[in-house]
Amino acid sequence: MNRDTSPDLHYLSGFGNEFASEALPGALPVGQNSPQKAPYGLYAELLSGTAFTMARSELRRTWLYRIRPSALHPRFERLARQPLGGPLGGINPNRLRWSPQPIPAEPTDFIEGWLPMAANAGAEKPAGVSIYIYRANRSMERVFFNADGELLLVPEQGRLRIATELGVMEVEPLEIAVIPRGMKFRVELLDGQARGYIAENHGAPLRLPDLGPIGSNGLANPRDFLTPVAHYEEAEGPVQLVQKFLGEHWACELQHSPLDVVAWHGSNVPYKYDLRRFNTIGTVSFDHPDPSIFTVLTSPTSVHGMANMDFVIFPPRWMVAENTFRPPWFHRNLMNEFMGLINGAYDAKAEGFLPGGASLHGVMSAHGPDAETCEKAIAADLAPHKIDNTMAFMFETSQVLRPSLQALECPQLQADYDSCWATLPSTFNPNRR
């Protein structure tokens, strides 16, 4: 199938907006959504990301004006190769850490290279999250959509060109991309190979966190989120359309590109965000604030203040707290923490936590800075200090994350992770305060 040449990429700015875009002038109907005859002979189609009757502030839906309706497809057949078919592992309360996963030697496109790491709900549930590491060394020729949830992509190696139904966006390490549930897309590799992390959100769509006493500005600012403008492919010829449904890959063959949306308007859109634009908040007096101040996006639950999933980053920042143990404190958490590292080093781990690696601390798993970090922090001169050239992140969820069997059996699982705390000394002296 012949594709259009790469367009000059343009974006719409904002988060949660009611956007509108057209690749041909006048392709958007005026004053209504579904006219008897749409402009240019297009078909009108609605893509719903939430229930019809959600509050307007939470509603996600987009009207698409396309060359052929999505209903024009044959029967889906289950693919023989099921890369995500492995079960969750047995109950395991231990702290876990993985070295970086290698890029496969055999040709592997974006959807073939997902390694399941952990999950806390089946895809049929209206809540929860599944976490993967993706690895790829060839661009996709087929098109994919995920019926199981919204996808948050966190590249660690390699730039991605993501062609979606609504337009094209390019994402590099230190940027993220979010693709709504059910939206068709294709991932092309701009650097030959790629690796990164995926959070598959089965719950409420991601949104910006409330700022509370921080005020009307700070953290991730809405204007820095970018949604691609309309771009369509008018191509004849066979293309495989793959869907992920309840964790399995099913496919059919089309005789046209399904990325044929000429115009669209709505709020259920793909977007990208540059993590370097995050307005980091921290103390200017004493103590280390809770890591919730680093939240970029959140998927809420019905319990106010408890997240189905938070996406949290630990970016470059100044440390100026006086009379304070500056690394993240020792902690036992109600929430479950899956961490990854995009570049640099994480300030709570001197060794062993590498870019492309991961860690999992389940509910009430005791964790904190390793022995080397702790020793240095207690003895440090508390002059202002900048943590630079780093970007760690966390997928945090209120439901227990169970590691996959593949993650527990892979050679990258570090058997000696607990040893990073083993040399923490007892410095208690009841005779000296």
Swiss-Prot record:
Homogentisate binds at residues 346, 367. GO terms for biological process: L-phenylalanine catabolic process; negative regulation of DNA-templated transcription; tyrosine catabolic process. InterPro entries: HgmA_C, HgmA_N, Homogentis_dOase, Homogentis_dOase_bac, RmlC-like_jellyroll, RmlC_Cupin_sf. Signal peptide: none annotated. SUPFAM superfamilies: RmlC-like cupins (SSF51182). One of its GO terms (molecular function) is homogentisate 1,2-dioxygenase activity. Keywords: Dioxygenase, Iron, Metal-binding, Oxidoreductase, Phenylalanine catabolism, Tyrosine catabolism. Induction: Induced by homogentisate and repressed by HmgR. Its cofactor is Fe cation. The keyword Nucleotidyltransferase does not apply. Coiled coil: none annotated. Fe cation binds at residues 331, 337, 367. Belongs to the homogentisate dioxygenase family. Hexamer; dimer of trimers. This is Homogentisate 1,2-dioxygenase.
